[in-house]
Amino acid sequence: MVFAFWKVFLILSCLAGQVSVVQVTIPDGFVNVTVGSNVTLICIYTTTVASREQLSIQWSFFHKKEMEPISIYFSQGGQAVAIGQFKDRITGSNDPGNASITISHMQPADSGIYICDVNNPPDFLGQNQGILNVSVLVKPSKPLCSVQGRPETGHTISLSCLSALGTPSPVYYWHKLEGRDIVPVKENFNPTTGILVIGNLTNFEQGYYQCTAINRLGNSSCEIDLTSSHPEVGIIVGALIGSLVGAAIIISVVCFARNKAKAKAKERNSKTIAELEPMTKINPRGESEAMPREDATQLEVTLPSSIHETGPDTIQEPDYEPKPTQEPAPEPAPGSEPMAVPDLDIELELEPETQSELEPEPEPEPESEPGVVVEPLSEDEKGVVKA
């Protein structure tokens, strides 16, 4: 009986010695590490092959956002290399049977699944792979508080609170600030989403609210003002609008007055030019031209030589300048000598429509002075004068 037992034991031992097996052990499959710190991922292995020349160790990383794992560390024959985002951050163990690695300066993006693979040909059987789930813990970042709806009495509003970072996911709590006291809100809210709904805002519910995001690493908070009335804001806005309207009115009045002044000045200049136009058309030859040249009549007056000799009994009369008319000269008294009178060329500028000859109206004959005889020109003399 005892002989038979030892016989079976020897047979099983021989069979086990002929099978090559690699066994990988992971002491802790869940690892939590705070952001910025170092973490050691423990992976222990055993192999039935004494030689380590063909031994290879590989670590892979599977991010939750990635579809396939990526290789981050590989070691074989004493040579190790880190790859990708973990380059220069991974240090591997050189101890036999220890495939652990240490990652420095962990970041939120390093959270995910890590896979340890150990191979030592000809050991191909057994459990040569281990899996670790690593979470990088992050304190909640300062949440963003916002309000949807009009924060006025009688309106329905909702308050939201959300932190962009935080591992594990934070939970949210709402409180109302009453002076120095922090009072939990009476309304129901969702601690997972951080949404607080106020169905009918009253004066009692108006004020300042605080939201706090909490996880195992810490907490952060934000505040929001639900004061519906802000008189100072209304005054500022009203003053600003009034200033803009007043400036616009002033600019309009100034522009209108300027344009009106320009129009009056332009009208005044045009009237002045119209009044000065007739003056600019005066004949440069002087006032001696009063009639057209073709209507000019030359008169010859003969005065006695005794006109220059005035006796003591002669009464001097004012000089008389004959008018430039075409009436015939009065007949001289008999016995007087004719006196030559300077020829007078009289021209009159007539309108185009009145170019026809005008018949001179007879004027009363001036009283002849004593001793002065004016004889009319004969037809022959008139012809000579006209020639």
Curated annotation (Swiss-Prot):
Tissue and organ expression note: Detected only in stomach mucosa and testis, and to a much lesser level in pancreas (at protein level). Detected in gastric cancers (31%), esophageal carcinomas (50%) and ovarian cancers (23%).
Subcellular location: Membrane
InterPro entries cross-referenced by the UniProt entry: Ig-like_dom, Ig-like_dom_sf, Ig-like_fold, Ig_sub, Ig_sub2, Ig_V-set, Myelin_P0-rel, VSIG1
Extracellular membrane side: 22-232
Keyword Transcription regulation belongs to the record: no
Membrane topology: Single-pass type I membrane protein
Post-translational modification: Highly N-glycosylated. Appears not to contain significant amounts of O-linked carbohydrates or sialic acid in its sugar moieties.
Major location (coarse): membrane
Record keywords: Disulfide bond, Glycoprotein, Immunoglobulin domain, Membrane, Repeat, Signal, Transmembrane, Transmembrane helix
Signal peptide: 1-21
Transmembrane segments: 233-253
Cystines in this chain: 43-116, 161-211
Single GO BP term: epithelial cell morphogenesis
Domain Ig-like V-type: 22-132
Skewed-composition ranges (Polar residues): 299-308
Cytoplasmic side stretches: 254-387
Superkingdom of this protein's organism: Eukaryota
Ig-like C2-type domain mapped to chain residues: 140-227
GO cellular component: basolateral plasma membrane
Bias (Acidic residues) ranges: 344-368
Location of the region described as Disordered in the Swiss-Prot/TrEMBL record: 266-387
Name recorded for this polypeptide: V-set and immunoglobulin domain-containing protein 1
Source organism: Homo sapiens
